[in-house]
C-alpha cells in the first residue's frame, strides 16, 4: 500500500486531527504518514492520536508564524513570493517520502476528510490527479487539477513537478496539467484522474459549470459496507476537501453544514455515527 504525505504548520493542526481520525476510521491498517512541519508544531502533531506511523521532519522553519497573506507579500528565496516557496515544499516532501522507502505517495492537504477507504491504484499508475471540475474561467486561473490530493510513484516525477513550479501560472497547482502531459508521454497508461467521488471540495459544488442545485441532486444515500453511505450517481464518496473548523468563509461553512446534514441521515451506519459525533464537536450550527 502507498503512503500518505502532508504539510502541517500551526494553522493545520486542527485539520490534521480530522485527517488522522478519518484515515483510521475507514482503513483497517492506517497508512504511514510523512509530514513536513516546524519545531513549534511538531509536538502538537505528535500529541494527535493516530494508530498508523507518523514520520515527521522539521522542514518548514522559514514559514514559522506566517499565514498566507503575509507570505504572499514577502519575497521568496527561490520563487517570486514566500508563499510560492511554501507551496513548492510539496514536491520536496514527496521526494523525501520516496527516499524513505515509500512505495508511491498520496499527497493530501491537511483538510482532507475521508468518507471511505483510500483509492486503489494499479501498479502501472505513476501519477494520479484530481480535477477541480469547475467552470472554465476559474480553471484558467487556478488550474485543471487540485494540488491538495495527488499521487505519484517516483522521485523523477516529484523532481519534474518542482521544475515546473518555476513557470506555473498558479503556484504549485497551475503546472499539474503540464506534469500530466509529461508523465503520459513517458509512461504509457501511467496517468490517471481520480473520479468525482474523490476530493470533493466546496469549489466543485459552488464553482461548477452547472447549477449547484443540480450537482447536489447527484448526491444520494447508498449504504455499502465500509463506506459512509453517501454516494454520487451510485458511486460511494471517498473524500471531501474542507476546513471543518472555519468560521469566516461562507462558502466553506455552507458546504460543511450541508455535508454534515447528509451524514446525519446515516447514523445507523456505525462508523458514520462515529464520524458525525466527531464532527459535531467542531461544526457549530
Question: Residue ranges of each PLM-predicted region?
Answer:
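Short, charged, surface-exposed secondary-structure boundary motifs
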Residues: 16-17, 21, 63-70, 136-145, ...
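Residues that flank catalytic or metal-binding motifs in active/ligand-binding sites
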Residues: 108, 145-148, 172, 236
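GT-A fold catalytic core of metal-dependent nucleotide-sugar glycosyltransferases
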Residues: 86-140, 144, 151, 155
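Extracytoplasmic beta-rich repeat domains
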Residues: 82-83
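Conserved glycosyltransferase catalytic-site signature
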Residues: 16, 91, 172-176
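Catalytic core and acceptor-binding pocket of nucleotide-sugar-dependent glycosyltransferases
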Residues: 155-255
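Short, solvent-exposed loop/turn segments at secondary-structure junctions
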Residues: 11-12, 40-41, 61-62, 112-114, ...
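N-terminal anchoring/stem segment of glycosyltransferases
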Residues: 1-76, 99-101, 259, 267-285
Amino acid at each position: 500500500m502507498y503512503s500518505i504525505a502532508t504539510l502541517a504548520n500551526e494553522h493545520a493542526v486542527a485539520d490534521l486531527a480530522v485527517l488522522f481520525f478519518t484515515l483510521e476510521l475507514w482503513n483497517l491498517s492506517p497508512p504511514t504518514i510523512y509530514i513536513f512541519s516546524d519545531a513549534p508544531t511538531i509536538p502538537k502533531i505528535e500529541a494527535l492520536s493516530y494508530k498508523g506511523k507518523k514520520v515527521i521532519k522539521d522542514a518548514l522553519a522559514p514559514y514559522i508564524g506566517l499565514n498566507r497573506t503575509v507570505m504572499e507579500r514577502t519575497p521568496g528565496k527561490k520563487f517570486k513570493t514566500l508563499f510560492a516557496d511554501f507551496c513548492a515544499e510539496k514536491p520536496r516532501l514527496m521526494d523525501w517520502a520516496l527516499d524513505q522507502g515509500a512505495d508511491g505517495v498520496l499527497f493530501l492537504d491537511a483538510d482532507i476528510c475521508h468518507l471511505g477507504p483510500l483509492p486503489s491504484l494499479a501498479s502501472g499508475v505513476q501519477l494520479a490527479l484530481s480535477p477541480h471540475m469547475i467552470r472554465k474561467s476559474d480553471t484558467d486561473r487556478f488550474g485543471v487539477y487540485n494540488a491538495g490530493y495527488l499521487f505519484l510513484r517516483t522521485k523523477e516525477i516529484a523532481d519534474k513537478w518542482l521544475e515546473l513550479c518555476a513557470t506555473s501560472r498558479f503556484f504549485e497547482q497551475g503546472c499539474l496539467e503540464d506534469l500530466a502531459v509529461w508523465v503520459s508521454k513517458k509512461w504509457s497508461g501511467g496517468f490517471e484522474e481520480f473520479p468525482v467521488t474523490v476530493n470533493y471540495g466546496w469549489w466543485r459544488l459552488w464553482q461548477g459549470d452547472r447549477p449547484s442545485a443540480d450537482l447536489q441532486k447527484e448526491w444520494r444515500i447508498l449504504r455499502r459496507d465500509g463506506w459512509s453511505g453517501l454516494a454520487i450517481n451510485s458511486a460511494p464518496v471517498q473524500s471531501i476537501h474542507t476546513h471543518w473548523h472555519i468560521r469566516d468563509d461562507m462558502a466553506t461553512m455552507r458546504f460543511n453544514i450541508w455535508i454534515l446534514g447528509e451524514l446525519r441521515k446515516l447514523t445507523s451506519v456505525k462508523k458514520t455515527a462515529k464520524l458525525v459525533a466527531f464532527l459535531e464537536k467542531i461544526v457549530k450550527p
